[in-house]
Amino acid sequence: MIRRTLAAAGTGLLVAAAGVAVAELLATAVRPQAAPLVAVGGAVVDGAPTPVKEWAVRTFGTYDKPLLLGGIGLALALLAALTGIAARRRPALGLLGPAVLGLAGVGAALTRPDAGPADALPALAGAAVAAGLLRRLPLPGRPAAPNTPDAAADPVGVGRAASGGGAAGSAGVGGPGGGGSDGDGHGAGGSGGSGSAGGPTRRAVVRNATLVAAGTVVAAAGAAVLRRLNVADAARSREAVRLPAPASPARPLPAGVAPGFRTPTEEFYRVDTALTVPRLDVDTWRLRLHGLVARPVEVSFAELLDRGLIERDVTLSCVSNEVGGPYVGTARWLGAPLAPLLRAAGIRAGADQLVARSDEGMTIGTPIETLLDGRDAMLAVGMNGAPLPFAHGFPVRMLTPGLYGYAGACKWVTELEVTTFDAFDAYWVRRGWAREAPVKTASRIDRPAPFARIPAGPVTVAGVAWAQHRGIAAVEVSVNGGPWRAAELLPTASTDTWVQWRYAWPATAGPHSLRVRATDGTGATQPERRRTPFPDGATGHHTITLTVR
């Protein structure tokens, strides 16, 4: 019995793999986001409670997406195995598995913000393939379908004891004409030298499983090849981009800036909901500006590059960043200023929100007043001297200095709608986050590292502090809860970037704690009270402990 159950579970897994492979292959022709695993993953992300999302980002960091997809894959494998077992006992019940999974895939695909009818095709095709194979593929212990090879020889199914034949439960291994057992103690009765009627042969099971496995490998390989071709095409599109010199270049970094002021592109944090990175073609990309405007605008990528680009050093930070966390970075950005585009469109009276929409359906709501107050809000096309990487929004992303990313930094942007906050809540606002999200003043100790063991003597404590668009006026350090001591501020690029700081500490032997706080350009000092990132950013003093030998 155990062996047959495992064989049936294996058949369920094989059938599910075939269905997924076909769905993935078809998704390469529709779009990557239509793949059932990705669509279901997106639905899970959208439906997960905010505390769960925050826990995932805090615990797994940038590995949260692969782990989510892996978890969905494991759940699918479990359901597939159970489906195979159910199909062995009751074929109709077994078909319920592909039906349920197919409906889940279709529902997830069609409820994505940017879904079209074609997005349902991969899940439908995968479910149909799985159901068809499950019905036609011989299962151990189940009679073969009418037009599949019969079990005239070497039966692996459980037969009823026939009159005049072998006894049920015989211990021997039967040949074509005898009652036998497949090793679990259940005999397959025969009559007058004939095999058990209607049961699949081992040869049929192996042959059909091999054919299905081969087809699955071919479909999966085809999907992989097509994905690689699509990625290569997108990469060529990006490599062909030649960014023009900025009409307003960034100022050179002042003397005295320490190494590491700018974050290398490959180390820049990434926090978003995209389970597959969109790879857009600059030749077909368009930006549509509409809504409460007098003159709707549509621009191509080439037209955007002709709009007199600006280049600025700007620090970005994520609202999910915990006190002392890593989700903050500084880069040199190149882009088209957003304010002239909005003014050219003619914003109508009463409009107070600009909603940016990405290619994969994300919505970001930004106060129009903020975009028009003179800050360097832009539609960025370049990062650290090169076109945007795909993971950071290629070909175009929105960037608003002084706001957290969820309120002013839409990646893969394709649409801008002028509207009101009363009329529309953006993605994160619908999930309880604040409508308006100016970056909170923050500071971090980067060295020494937490729990470090260092020798006694002069020690340089160093880190960064940021309050984009307000600037940093002072940074202070406290040792072991003692008085606050002023740290030295290094030169910086502008109020839109972080400030590097350092503090000379005469370290003495023993355990110690170090704490940092910053004061922004308005004179407001970081509050000591610890708060989680939800709903508008974390607060509190970054504190580390270490041992001096």
Map each language-model feature to its residues.
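Membrane-anchoring hydrophobic segments
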Residues: M1-A92
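Structured, non-membrane catalytic/scaffold regions adjacent to prosthetic-group chemistry
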Residues: L25, A29, A34, A77-L78, ...
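Membrane-embedded alpha-helical segments of integral membrane proteins
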Residues: Y63-P149
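N-terminal secretory signal peptides and thylakoid transit peptides that target proteins
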Residues: G195-A213
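Secretion-targeting segments and adjacent low-complexity export tracts
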Residues: V205, G215, A220-A232
